[in-house]
Amino acid sequence: MRKVFIPLLASVPALSVAFLATLAPTSVRAVPSYARQTGLPCSGCHYTPPELNPAGRKFKLLGYVDKDKERPGLEIKDESKSHHAGLDLLSSLPFSAMFETSLATTKTPQPGTQNGNFEFPQDVSVFLAGAWADHVGSFLQVTYNAQDDHFSIDNTDIRYAKTRKVGGKDLVYGVNLNNNPGVEDLWNSTPAWGFPWIASDSAPTPTAAPIIAGPLAQDVAGIGGYAMWGDHLYVDGAIYRSDHVGNPQPNSGSGLGYNIRGVAPYWRVAWQQLTPKAQYELGAYGMHMASTPGAVVGLEDKYTDTAVDFQVDRTLFRKDVLSLRGTYIRENSTLAATFAAMGAQVSSHHLDTIFTNAEYHFGNRLSGTVGWFDTGGTVDPLLYAQSAVSGSANGNPRGAGYIGNFSFFPMQNIQLGVQYTGYTRFNGAAINYDGAGRNASGNNTWYLLARFIF
């Protein structure tokens, strides 16, 4: 799993981060160590991996600590009584591993490169995923990526959670440590855990993306608190600092597109309604960040993201599930630092991003998904500069298209997937978008994946 944050040189605008970082493969998994801990199959918490069902959302909310009652924690005996050790260790440590191999081909080869990229592996991951103690658990992933040829920390979510009664209803509350804004979320409608579930790491992707939709992933460290009241109202808040893993510490900011000044606050609120055959969620989330690109002092670029999202899961024909999801993100930014460095033609910018998708789960073995995405915003020939394949001839950040995915799970820990991504706009145009003769449709991508997790 490659990181979705792409470090930028100080002279490169901070907004020039791959838009499809938001469409890159995310780290959410049906991790077998959870199944071993709870005694449940993967379908106990997922419609089809990685989409969480109500039980899966509850398991995450409670800090990944629920256990099979037939497999108690480690007991220490003395002459007078038996009692649970304070660490409540499992009979086996909560480790899992994953192997992915893939084949990707674009309609038009990238200049000077071969088409049909076969990666064996694309990613190899190890997970520490499960209960650490009575109220503490984690989803922690370390990934080797063949493109980077090294291991790195991937999406990580460590929780402390408890429950009490408030107003006659259950209040679940907790503290969360994570490295990606939104990674703590319970639904699959927001960018951190959103569709597509798989994607090529070699195919071209559009340039522009809101900061809340991928550019900060695995490049920040955050702490926050969350609560769910009555299985209806969910609130979450966190603050983030830059954490440039793999770079010298203390941080100098050199060569990095985002260096958070102070802290960057993140907020989330959602309402869910549960019925015997359907679950509904409607929410909002956002983030504010001040950053000094390429340094830790000086003029600042400021970003404010505000978003709304929804998710509907409806059971059909007893075992099938239809899922509808979507989010709209508005980003307003003032790029004083980038403008002063002549990296932008104007200082005030905005981006508007929409992701929507519909998925049909045929039991827990097959799923088909169709998604649509669209990002547009302020035209700026310096911020979105011209270059072959990755640039824009007109300075327009528009990127739009569709994704079709079909996944088959012959066993609960094996996924075979085929996916097609088509572009109607790429970096501002459909025809000759880069000024070098490449069309948006030239980046249309077929992608095949085999994933094994155990």
Regions found by a protein language model. Give the residues of each.
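Outer-membrane beta-barrel "beta-signal"
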Residues: 41, 408, 414, 440-454
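The canonical Cys-X-X-Cys-His
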Residues: 39-50
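Detector for outer-membrane/organellar transmembrane beta-barrel domains
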Residues: 278-404, 408, 420
